[in-house]
Amino acid sequence: MMDIKEIREYLPHRYPFLLVDRVTELDIENKNIRAYKNVSVNEPFFNGHFPEHPIMPGVLIIEAMAQAAGILAFKMLDSKPSDGTLYYFVGSDKLRFRQPVLPGDQLVLEAKFLSSKRQIWKFECKATVDGKAVCSAEIICAERKL
């Protein structure tokens, strides 16, 4: 549904911090999104986390979920970063890690809009690999005008 070219229109992140490779489902009416991150052994973070037993850092899994949520927020408002608005990841609730993400895994990212109040948006997010939960959290983002 969204290729990397279109994703780059909705996320200000760039290599090595752009963590969404593809969006396959985006349902504005039901306020949810499904996106993917293909985890390659060539990711720069594997050089130090951990060279002999590479594991994707948990904070980057959270960031990937937040980026998927950001795309959903922009699409819900029919806006883009180029319009002068950004969403900053400002917190999480109910955060849980369930298993490690390894080189070669395909991370499935899902986000559902829960609520917004005074430019603070909350999303229910989860990440899975091969149908197994690896991370879940309520992600909180702040909308900011540039």
Curated annotation (Swiss-Prot):
Family recorded in the similarity comment: Belongs to the thioester dehydratase family. FabZ subfamily.
Gene Ontology annotations of biological process type: fatty acid biosynthetic process; lipid A biosynthetic process
InterPro entries xrefs: FabA_FabZ, FabZ, HotDog_dom_sf
Location of the active site: 49
Chemical reaction(s) catalysed: a (3R)-hydroxyacyl-[ACP] = a (2E)-enoyl-[ACP] + H2O
Enzyme Commission number: 4.2.1.59
Organism of provenance: Pseudomonas savastanoi pv. phaseolicola (strain 1448A / Race 6) (Pseudomonas syringae pv. phaseolicola (strain 1448A / Race 6))
Location relative to the cell: Cytoplasm
Taxonomy, superkingdom: Bacteria
CDD domains recorded: FabZ
Gene3D superfamilies for the chain: Hotdog Thioesterase
GO CC terms in record: cytoplasm; membrane
A Gene Ontology molecular function term of the record: (3R)-hydroxyacyl-[acyl-carrier-protein] dehydratase activity
Function: Involved in unsaturated fatty acids biosynthesis. Catalyzes the dehydration of short chain beta-hydroxyacyl-ACPs and long chain saturated and unsaturated beta-hydroxyacyl-ACPs.
SUPFAM superfamilies: Thioesterase/thiol ester dehydrase-isomerase
Identification of the protein by name: 3-hydroxyacyl-[acyl-carrier-protein] dehydratase FabZ
Key words, A-Z: Cytoplasm, Lipid A biosynthesis, Lipid biosynthesis, Lipid metabolism, Lyase
